[in-house]
């Protein structure tokens, strides 16, 4: 007999196939099966079924499928919210028992002294606490905005990620790297938020949510490193084009009055012809207006 986790994973795989084939036939039956199952946060995180349901919701044009998928995601979000609330309570409550325990053991100073070095021991320095706490208003506001960015498009529900904990860790890394909350810190936070919310670059957000990109990494990544693959290719092509045009401008070219500049309407131009395609195709002509600097090309 198939276990609950295996059954949910099987449904997730079938939903993924429907998304790949762009066919939602039978989706309602699978979604109803999921609705009837008592799904825990552990099952949500281990099977990643939320990602499959969310992908189906985005692709489907069937209103009934969309509505049921949204209902499931909403109910699973409550599991995450409950988990977040418990984590916050633990974060608030953990220091109190420690201090009260220290107080109860205070009568013997010789016992209290050796315990002090253990609190900031090496593991606490090299690893982050579950939820780094700060009382700074600016830092807390930045954490809220990072949380909102991570929650874009409900990917956190599908992945089963704790956005508040993640945002706190990311902000902590940024603060440690910059050292204060001045303009450099704010610009760093702002650029993370912008890239995490970018609808054209969902992979960055998903990689952060699932841990493929750690808080330490996202905290120091450049705009180029955070960019989508598509934008990276565009930037690469633009750089190549700029280098080529610069090299052509330095070669001088041939001065002519055969071309009319579309910008200043003068005929004082310099042109260069280059074989940019295969040898049996026409050469590309690059033209520079010597009057206003306007550039254009044609084959």
Curated annotation (Swiss-Prot):
NCBIfam families: TFSII. Its main location: nucleus. There is a cross-link at residue 58 (Glycyl lysine isopeptide (Lys-Gly) (interchain with G-Cter in ubiquitin)). A zinc finger (TFIIS-type) spans 257-297. Residues 138-254 form the TFIIS central domain. This is Transcription elongation factor A protein 2. Residues 6-83 form the TFIIS N-terminal domain. Keywords: DNA-binding, Isopeptide bond, Metal-binding, Nucleus, Phosphoprotein, Transcription, Transcription regulation, Ubl conjugation, Zinc, Zinc-finger. It comes from Homo sapiens (Human). Belongs to the TFS-II family. InterPro entries: TF_IIS-typ, TFIIS/CRSP70_N_sub, TFIIS/LEDGF_dom_sf, TFIIS_cen_dom, TFIIS_cen_dom_sf, TFIIS_N, TFSII, Znf_TFIIS. One of its GO terms (biological process) is regulation of transcription by RNA polymerase II. The keyword Iron does not apply. Zn(2+) binds at residues 261, 264, 289, 292. The gene is TCEA2.
């Amino acid at each position: 007999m198939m276990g609950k986790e295996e059954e949910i994973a099987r449904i997730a795989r079938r939903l993924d196939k429907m998304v790949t084939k762009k066919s939602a036939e039978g989706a309602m039956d699978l979604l109803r099966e999921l609705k009837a199952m008592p799904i825990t946060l552990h099952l949500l995180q281990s099977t990643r079924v939320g990602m499959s349901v969310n992908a189906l919701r985005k692709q489907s044009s069937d209103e009934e499928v969309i509505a049921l998928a949204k209902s499931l995601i909403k109910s699973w979000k409550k599991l995450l919210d409950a988990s977040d609330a418990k984590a916050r309570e633990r974060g608030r409550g953990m220091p109190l028992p420690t201090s009260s325990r220290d107080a109860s053991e205070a009568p013997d100073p010789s016992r209290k002294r050796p315990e002090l070095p253990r609190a900031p021991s090496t593991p606490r320095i090299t690893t982050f606490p579950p939820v780094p706490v700060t009382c700074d208003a600016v830092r807390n506001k930045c954490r809220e905005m990072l949380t909102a960015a991570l929650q874009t498009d409900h990917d956190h529900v599908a992945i089963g990620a704790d956005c508040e904990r993640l945002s706190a860790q990311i902000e902590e890394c940024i603060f440690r790297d910059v050292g204060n909350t001045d303009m450099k810190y704010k610009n760093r936070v702002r650029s993370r938020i912008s890239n995490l919310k970018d609808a054209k670059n969902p992979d960055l957000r998903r990689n952060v949510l699932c841990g493929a990109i750690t808080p330490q990494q996202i905290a120091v990544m450049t705009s180029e490193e955070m960019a989508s693959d598509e934008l990276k290719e565009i930037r690469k092509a633009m750089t190549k084009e700029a280098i080529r045009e610069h090299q052509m401008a330095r070669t001088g070219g041939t001065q002519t009055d055969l071309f009319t500049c579309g910008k200043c309407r003068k005929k004082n131009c310099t042109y260069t012809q280059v074989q940019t395609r295969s040898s049996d195709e026409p050469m590309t002509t690059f033209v520079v207006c010597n009057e206003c600097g306007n550039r254009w090309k044609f084959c």
